[in-house]
Amino acid sequence: MSRRTSAQKRSVNPDPKFNSRLASMMVARLMDSGKKSLAFRILYSAFDLIQERTGNDPLELFEQAVRNATPLVEVRARRVGGATYQVPMEVRSERGTAMALRWLVQYSRQRPGKSMAIKLANELMDAANETGSSVRKREETHKMAEANKAFAHYRY
């Protein structure tokens, strides 16, 4: 383990169009090989599609989708006397948001179809309606934590 002092948290600059830190974090997760302008284009295209289909504010729907995909508890491996236990632990808000964004991008990429903007828009709309793979992943994470509740006293 590093003996240095822990690294300073970097502040996230909000995106230029919506002035949202969450949208900026999403762009960072979408970005591939440093192509940030392409990631912005994909996100904004997805927001335009959401606006067309629902008529609602796409940023509100996006925030709702992230809230619905954010896990509250997770299991972490803890080794005790030769045995490894899956210990349920609460998730800090920043980590929960990061996990939700990662899952939204991951399951958007796995969807069938051509355009990433369309796939992302569909995943965001599904997550906002509490369906979709990213919300299912959160439910699985919660189930795992519930199943391993007996090992909660090993928390660290």
UniProtKB/Swiss-Prot annotation:
Superkingdom of this protein's organism: Bacteria
Pfam families according to UniProt: Ribosomal_S7
PROSITE patterns in UniProt: RIBOSOMAL_S7
InterPro entries from the UniProt entry: Ribosomal_uS7 (IPR000235), Ribosomal_uS7_bac/org-type (IPR005717), Ribosomal_uS7_CS (IPR020606), Ribosomal_uS7_dom (IPR023798), Ribosomal_uS7_dom_sf (IPR036823)
GO MF term (any one): structural constituent of ribosome
Species this protein is from: Synechococcus elongatus (strain ATCC 33912 / PCC 7942 / FACHB-805) (Anacystis nidulans R2)
Gene Ontology CC annotations of this record: small ribosomal subunit
Subunit details: Part of the 30S ribosomal subunit. Contacts proteins S9 and S11.
Family indicated by similarity: Belongs to the universal ribosomal protein uS7 family.
Name of protein: Small ribosomal subunit protein uS7
NCBIfam families: rpsG_bact (TIGR01029)
Keyword line: Ribonucleoprotein, Ribosomal protein, RNA-binding, rRNA-binding, tRNA-binding
PANTHER family according to UniProt: RIBOSOMAL PROTEIN S7
Role noted for this protein: One of the primary rRNA binding proteins, it binds directly to 16S rRNA where it nucleates assembly of the head domain of the 30S subunit. Is located at the subunit interface close to the decoding center, probably blocks exit of the E-site tRNA.
Single Gene Ontology BP annotation: translation
